[in-house]
Amino acid sequence: MIFVDRTDEMARFRAALTQEKPSLVALYGRRRLGKSTLIKKVLSEQDVYFLADRSEAQHQRILLAKVLGQQFPDFDKVEYPDWEAIFRAVNYRTEKRFTLCLDEFPYLVEQSPELPSVLQKLVDERLLKYNLILCGSSQNMMYGLFLDSTAPLYGRTDELMRLAPLRLPYMQEALGLDDAGTIEEYAVWGGVPRYWELREHRASFEEAIWHNVFSVNGALYEEPVKLFRDDVKDIVKISTIMSYIGAGANRISEIAARCNEPTTNLSRPLKKLIDLGFLERDILFGVDEKNAKKSLYKIADPFMAFYYQFVVPNLSFIELGRRLPIEQALKAHFQEYVSMQWEKLCREACTGNVINGILYGKAGRWWGTLVGEDKKLEQAEFDVVAESFDKKYLLVGECKWTNKENAYRLIAELERKASLLPFAEKHTIVPILFLKNAPTEDCKQAMLPKDVIALLK
């Protein structure tokens, strides 16, 4: 698969590694995002890349010495009793500055808790003659090592980067998909390059899902558990919470009831999942997040959302190789699932972008009770709501992932409901339809997948 995006990260790497003094760079993020691939794109032939494992410290030093032996002849002929000894030995042998990358750095720290203090000493004394890249998939450990104010390496990095999933347009570029196909496939694979690579190896979207996800031998069959192992101690509880949310329990009271626990017991695991990027809080548009009492918990990662909606309920069928029940579940609910991901993408597309000459702020959802002119109450939901930066306009959007929509009817109903919103006063309402296909009528207020993809670039 072609290497796409990451231009900002590569530029930051190169700037740090070529500055006058040796640099310390840290890179972290969940697995499968391409951290190692990115680093290898930056490293040159004279640089040294070392991938740590979970073996004992002395064995790790032996392995590192062997790798360094390719750069410095006979470097591995010596036994190094501790980490300071090996780093100082590299210093002694360094004549021309190069870069040493320690990938999965948290594995080294697990076996040698003193390692961050050793590196702090070398950095503070300005003894290093070479650049150091420290990379890790354990977001908790990397955060604790570099962002905790009490940690030895806090404030010592020249660059500290958290790698995020790639944006949707880059998947279209990497896999050569049409616009609607890009939306549907992103709803499953999300912005994770490794998943795109697995998809590319199969002839079709359907084949890729069955081969990698709905198979006991599939590369992604146990993916969530593998991801949780890096950062979560109680995997059973975390996976249970994700399962309930994936099944539609979105309020904390609903999740607590299914877990048979008080809501107070869920605050920490829910926050943990949000910090790791697996969950998000859906808050009413216009409400400050800190003061929000009315919120919904949703699975943030598309693949995780797909997994907990379609894989977890069908694990028994997958284990038995029963394909038909899974096919029926996909036929009945997959398009509805895509429509939920489509809504989220439409909100992202509107946030901070110019649409029809108007710049909008952060887009969100709104749901609740509207009061009509006749004082009649009605329940309503708006998929997309965004206020313009000048406070003059209010974009309200309806998202549909179905065919042959009556655009005029939808626009009229959208305008009617929007006029009843409690915060609509003194705003010009801008109704927008986000549709899978072009409407049967000529409608200038419709945005299609190609328009949304363009805004997400």
Language-model segment annotations:
Residues 295-457:
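A cross-kingdom feature that marks ATP-driven nucleic-acid transaction machinery
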Residues 1-324, 328:
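Phosphate-binding site recognition
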